[in-house]
């Protein structure tokens, strides 16, 4: 039984390792489609007013598009690898303009999946686009609803009639309930745009991926090995970092609690919050290198340094690394 469970887990791990981005995009698209349907049913209602119908439709069409794009950029790890510490990188480690531009393009492309899915579903639905253009088919002289004097007078008697009809040019009730023939025409046009967007996005994605892989200096098998190495390296780095941080934190904590008693000053030291503008806990300064060879990250470390305690470095069982001493720092 245990063997079967392990086999299933292994299969899922392999699937996510090899096709993780594809599965993630699929889940993202499905979530976007479901979210659009929910928004359409619960919140969207075309207003019987011009030009409010235009603004209302555009907000629902492109507002979530911009939000999804921004969220995609925010959650992309490459964004923060490029941005984090940008102004304080050592000159030799700064990314070249070529690398920066290519990386940002990749981030934008990866973040465009959900926005494009949203636009596709929005145009395929047709309701938003119909509302956006319905006033074009609702001239007050032609609209059937406004030929009914009772309906027209009920709108004309309101103080906002001139605002919602562009001074009597459009028929307000027709904007939110257009003629069925006109509504069908607008919905069909919207769906054409939807499939055109999908076709264009698919072709563009295929061409970009193809060109990128054709220009890759690695073969497919070698690229798979490189990606495997990157993943394993990240896992190992995190594991060793946790071990190192755990030992260092334990040494600092034992130094603090190894005292017989503590003054209020001691507790004030370890209760601080690192702030950029605070000279005591300045992140940018990181306790200048001339004071200590060990970078300080937390108030507890600062307290130990202020006390003059020498905290031993973590003793990690690492494979011996041969350093080329002919290279200058």
Swiss-Prot record:
Keywords, alphabetical: Calcium, Calcium channel, Calcium transport, Cell membrane, Glycoprotein, Ion channel, Ion transport, Membrane, Transmembrane, Transmembrane helix, Transport, Voltage-gated channel
Disruption phenotype: Uncoordinated locomotion with mutants showing reduced forward velocity, muscle force and power production.
Biological processes per GO annotation: ATP export; calcium ion transmembrane transport; regulation of locomotion
Signal sequence segment: none
Entry keyword Nucleus: no
Protein's membrane topology: Multi-pass membrane protein
Membrane-spanning residues: 15-35, 54-74, 104-124, 192-212
Location within or outside the cell: Cell membrane
GO CC aspect terms: monoatomic ion channel complex; non-motile cilium; plasma membrane
Membrane topology, Cytoplasmic segments: 1-14, 75-103, 213-329
Protein name: Calcium homeostasis modulator protein
Taxonomic path: Eukaryota, Metazoa, Ecdysozoa, Nematoda, Chromadorea
Gene: clhm-1
């Amino acid at each position: 039984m245990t063997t079967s469970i392990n086999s299933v887990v292994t299969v899922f791990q392999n699937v996510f390792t090899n096709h993780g981005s594809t599965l993630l995009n699929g889940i993202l698209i499905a979530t976007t489609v479901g979210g659009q349907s929910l928004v359409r049913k619960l919140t969207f209602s075309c207003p019987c007013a011009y030009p409010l119908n235009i603004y209302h439709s555009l907000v629902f069409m492109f507002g979530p598009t911009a939000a999804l794009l921004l969220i995609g950029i925010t959650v992309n790890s490459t964004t923060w690898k490029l941005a984090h510490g940008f102004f304080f990188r050592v000159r030799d480690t700064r990314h070249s303009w070529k690398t920066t531009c290519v990386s940002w393009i990749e981030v934008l492309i990866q973040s465009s999946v959900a926005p494009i899915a949203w636009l596709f579903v929005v145009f395929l639905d047709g309701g938003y686009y119909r509302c956006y253009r319905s006033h074009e088919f609702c001239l007050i002289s032609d609209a059937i609803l406004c030929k009914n004097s009772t309906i027209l007078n009920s709108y004309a008697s309101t103080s906002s009639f001139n605002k919602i009809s562009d001074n009597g040019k459009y028929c307000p009730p027709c904007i939110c309930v257009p003629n069925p023939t006109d509504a069908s025409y607008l919905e069909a046009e919207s769906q054409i745009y939807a499939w055109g967007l999908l076709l264009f996005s698919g072709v563009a994605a295929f061409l970009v991926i193809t060109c990128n892989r054709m220009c890759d200096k690695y073969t497919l098998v070698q690229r798979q090995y490189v990606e495997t190495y990157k993943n394993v390296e990240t896992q190992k780095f995190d594991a060793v970092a946790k071990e190192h941080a755990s030992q260092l934190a334990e040494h600092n904590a034992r130094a603090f609690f190894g005292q017989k008693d503590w003054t209020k000053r001691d507790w004030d030291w370890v209760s601080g919050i690192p702030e950029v503008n605070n000279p005591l806990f300045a992140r940018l300064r990181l306790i200048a290198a001339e004071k200590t060879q060990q970078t300080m990250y937390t108030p507890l470390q600062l307290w130990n340094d202020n006390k003059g305690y020498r905290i031993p470095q973590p003793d990690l069982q690492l494979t011996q690394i041969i350093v080329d001493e002919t290279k200058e720092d």
